[in-house]
Amino acid sequence: MGLVIYDTLARRKVPFEPAVPGHVGIYVCGPTVYADPHLGHARGPVVYDVLRRYLLHKGYKVRFVSNITDVGHLTDDADEGEDKIVRRAKLERLEPMEVAEKYTWSYFDAMQALNVLRPSIAPRASGHIPEMLELTERLLARGVAYERKGSVYFRVRSFPEYGKLSGKRLEELRAGARVEVREEKEDPLDFALWKAAEPGHIMRWKSPWGEGYPGWHIECTAMSLKYLGEGFDLHAGGIDLQFPHHECEIAQAEAAGFRFARHWMHHNHVLLEGEKMAKSTGNLVLLHDLLEAHEPMALRFYLLQTHYRSPMDFTWEGLESAKRGYGRLLHAYREVRGRKKTAPPGTTPELERALDALEKAFMEAIEDDLSTPEALAALFAFLPELHKLLPEAKAESLARAEAVFHTLGEGILGLFPERVLEERVSGPLLEGLIALLLELREEARRAKDYEKSDLIRERLRALGVIVEDTKEGPRWRLER
């Protein structure tokens, strides 16, 4: 079938066909690095990581660009307020670039824990001021921007297609615009390409219009065009960036005479108690807290259980359920690896057919607008047949099953790095806890409470602890 994505600009699912055969250029809006990331910041990177992994699996060469916003993102996301990083620098009594560096690495560390591939290029806005100035001067020369008091604004009315991404109309936007706009603006909808620095503003650069700093929207336009060129394949980001950020990006690029992104994808919010997770409101769960307390791959699994275009409601119960579900898949993968070593040679036709069905269902799901919930469902649907066939399975079929688990589960979904397949917990605490559970199981057996006894055994098995009943009593071993 080939990959089909929901294109926000087209407002429908469309075939994803790269402009240059065999090559894909993707730009994803990255974080504004003024605080530690929360769970909402992980959703986009995980989703687009799956897309990237799928394309790599299909043999494409992928240039994946995701920026770091370390200047110009103001506190009200428009043209007023204080730079978010400058504000944090004052609170922490640090230089702005110290703040940016600190939280950039906080973000990268979290992404590494979640098994997200590093971007091909991770450009920082502060390192691309010349490109932004050049683009601003080009817009001025074309008459679609104007300078007032050292600031430069984009003239929205000069771009009739403004609103084509979000579906918003200029008349409606003007009707809802704030009255108390800056005096130097010709129109309330005009947005800043370059801002004159107020006295005492820390982050400032020289420009033809005086010292200042870039507007937020022009940063991504300049960097995406620099590293991916005109008409690159895909621009992606959170649904909250669709307007005004991405709308303004399109206006800037096309008004400057450049062909911009061919496709647009947007992922939905992560919600906590029905409200969007956000640093600005404090309604959040910090990513590092979750990663320290829970298996990172179970957290990644949790994020992939909901389709990227649907809101995701975070609950602790949902996370615990995801941990159990992930444990089932990991257990199955480990069991296949372990049994392969001692299985007799040959193939098992029933297992081969089950693997064929799994691969078909999985790829159909991924190629249908990255339906990761359906892809996971295909893996779970395969498990009963796998467990039924494992005791008699032959080595060649088990080797194929291992390869399929690796390709689908790790290669595309990114859920099974070697660390989780090999990592073992040991020590007195582990041994003591297992001994306690086995003692409770023996008490249940003596009381003929076989349901409870079986439940303890199965729960231990799901955690990778194999219990064997012998004449001398129960023995346990960690699954290999």
UniProtKB/Swiss-Prot annotation:
Motif ('KMSKS' region): 276-280
TM regions (residue ranges): none
Cofactor note: Binds 1 zinc ion per subunit.
Cofactor requirement: Zn(2+)
E.C. code: 6.1.1.16
Family matches, as InterPro entries: Cys-tRNA-ligase, Cys-tRNA-synt_Ia_DALR, Cys-tRNA/MSH_ligase, CysS_C, Rossmann-like_a/b/a_fold, tRNA-synt_1_cat_dom, tRNAsynth_Ia_anticodon-bd
Keywords linked to the UniProt accession: Aminoacyl-tRNA synthetase, ATP-binding, Cytoplasm, Ligase, Metal-binding, Nucleotide-binding, Protein biosynthesis, Zinc
Family annotation (Gene3D superfamilies): Cysteine-tRNA ligase, C-terminal anti-codon recognition domain (1.20.120.1910), HUPs (3.40.50.620)
HAMAP family on file: Cys_tRNA_synth
Oligomeric form and interacting partners: Monomer.
Name by which UniProt lists this protein: Cysteine--tRNA ligase
Native organism: Thermus thermophilus (strain ATCC 27634 / DSM 579 / HB8)
